[in-house]
């Protein structure tokens, strides 16, 4: 065999799919599938069949192109082991590092508030509807749940990290199983409501506005941006030295594409199954009640008259328990990120980044009190969760996931080769539409 043939054979072997590629595909997929998915069917099904079909068309491009853009930004740094903060500082200086620190903190903290509201509402509806117990004081319930989680986090963080990682796959399996099990309960209500002769495109309940608002919940639900930096560093260390950055970029894009396909398939099937089981009016009721779709399904099956099937009985109780586990998993993961982000801000601005000037134990305690206290205030106030996602959570995620990479592509020389592409226009448009939701919510 010639030298050229050997090189080609070696490259073909190395470029083949590895076990680590499968691990990262599932890791990206698992990061995105959390409590946010439980609200996607409500927003997606709120406007009926046509908007959710349009969202189905948009789902994969949003998931793939936006995360690929962020991955390309992470790949553009000169240090293969450098994370996104180091890369942004390399391109834009210390100011860029400060901006990314702020963005990370404010992208995660509102999500924690959202989960604080969600876990309170989910527990209360389970307590009152499934257990048939008298209503409890909302402030007490929120405080009890947050203190319980704070206790677990404080005394068993390492154990909980392992437990939560194991819960990802049972939760995903539960979503798929529920989606399949709902098929016998599908009905034609959502199809019957379609009137092609009287389609409203604009207006508050028009198709375009519904899809526009749906983009925000897709950005929120299809989001694995917190793990992209670690993913890219891992792949650069695995491939870049031997095969170069271009090969590494193609490998990262391939993994992100497959993870996005898996994510869209599971989430959209779950959303369609919920919509065909319920109706657009049921989705509107779920939004008004401010509860995730699994809690609404539990209440829906609890209200069925006559003899119930075994599945209906199991779902009546199991759906809320699955929702609580999913929310706790998401809350725990986002709490760690929020704590890290808040500590980073305090160290950067209060101690100029010098960890020796402060006790980390004391800093963790103060940060925990602030985080849990602010979460309790929001949980007690009980703002509408979808409105909170659309007005706060999704726009900040879009700033980090969509607009920051697009700005870097325009300004950073190492990203110049990606300029002038149509997918850049798409990612920028998704980011701007998501952020403009803030204006829509105000007016």
UniProtKB/Swiss-Prot annotation:
The gene is tdcC. NCBIfam families: PRK13629.1, stp. Its main location: membrane. It is a multi-pass membrane protein. The keyword Zinc does not apply. The chain crosses the membrane at residues 22-42, 44-64, 97-117, 140-160, 163-183, 207-227, 259-279, 319-339, 366-386, 389-409, 423-443. It comes from the Bacteria. It catalyses: L-threonine(in) + H(+)(in) = L-threonine(out) + H(+)(out); L-serine(in) + H(+)(in) = L-serine(out) + H(+)(out). It is found in: Cell inner membrane. Involved in the import of threonine and serine into the cell, with the concomitant import of a proton (symport system). This is Threonine/serine transporter TdcC. Belongs to the amino acid/polyamine transporter 2 family. SdaC/TdcC subfamily. Keywords: Amino-acid transport, Cell inner membrane, Cell membrane, Membrane, Symport, Transmembrane, Transmembrane helix, Transport. Signal peptide: none annotated. GO terms for molecular function: L-serine transmembrane transporter activity; symporter activity; threonine efflux transmembrane transporter activity. It comes from Salmonella newport (strain SL254). HAMAP family: Thr_Ser_transp_TdcC. GO terms for cellular component: plasma membrane. Pfam families: Trp_Tyr_perm.
């Amino acid at each position: 065999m010639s030298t050229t043939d050997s090189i080609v054979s070696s490259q073909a072997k190395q470029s083949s799919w590895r076990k680590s590629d499968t691990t990262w595909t599932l890791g990206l997929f698992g990061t995105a599938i959390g409590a946010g998915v439980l609200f996607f069917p409500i927003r997606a099904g709120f406007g009926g069949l046509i908007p959710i079909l349009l969202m189905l068309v948009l789902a994969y491009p949003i998931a793939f192109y936006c995360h690929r853009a962020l991955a390309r930004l992470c790949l553009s740094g000169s240090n293969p082991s450098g994370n996104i903060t180091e890369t942004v500082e390399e391109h834009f200086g210390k100011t860029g590092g400060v901006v990314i620190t702020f963005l990370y903190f404010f992208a995660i903290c509102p999500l924690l508030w959202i989960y604080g509201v969600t876990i309170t509402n989910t527990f209360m509806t389970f307590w009152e509807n499934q257990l048939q117990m008298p209503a409890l004081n909302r402030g007490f319930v929120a405080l009890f749940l947050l203190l319980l989680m704070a206790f677990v986090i404080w005394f068993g963080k390492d154990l909980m990290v392992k437990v939560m990682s194991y819960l990802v796959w049972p939760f995903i399996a539960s979503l798929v199983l529920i989606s399949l099990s709902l098929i016998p309960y599908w009905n034609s209500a959502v199809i019957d409501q379609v009137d092609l002769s009287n389609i409203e495109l604009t207006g508050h309940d028009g198709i375009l506005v519904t899809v526009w608002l749906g983009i925000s919940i897709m950005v929120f639900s299809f989001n694995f941006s917190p793990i992209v930096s670690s993913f890219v560093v891992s792949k650069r260390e695995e491939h870049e030295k031997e095969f170069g950055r271009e090969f590494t970029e193609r490998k990262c894009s391939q993994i992100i594409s497959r993870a996005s396909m898996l994510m869209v398939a599971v989430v959209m099937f779950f959303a369609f199954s919920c919509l065909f089981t319920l109706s657009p009016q049921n989705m509107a009721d779920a939004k008004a009640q401010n509860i995730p779709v699994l809690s609404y399904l539990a209440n829906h099956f609890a209200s069925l008259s006559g003899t119930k099937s075994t599945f209906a009985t199991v779902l009546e109780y199991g759906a809320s328990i699955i929702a609580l586990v999913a929310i706790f998993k998401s809350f725990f993961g986002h709490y760690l990120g929020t704590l890290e982000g808040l500590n980073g801000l305090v160290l950067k601005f209060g101690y100029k980044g010098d960890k020796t000037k402060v006790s980390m134990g004391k800093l963790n305690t103060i940060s925990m009190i602030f985080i849990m206290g602010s979460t309790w205030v929001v949980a007690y106030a009980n703002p509408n969760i979808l409105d909170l996602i659309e007005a706060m959570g999704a726009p900040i995620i879009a700033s980090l996931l969509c607009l920051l990479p697009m700005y870097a592509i325009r300004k950073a020389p190492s990203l110049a080769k990606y300029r002038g592409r149509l997918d850049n226009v798409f990612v920028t448009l998704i980011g701007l539409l998501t952020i403009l939701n803030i204006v829509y919510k105000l007016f």
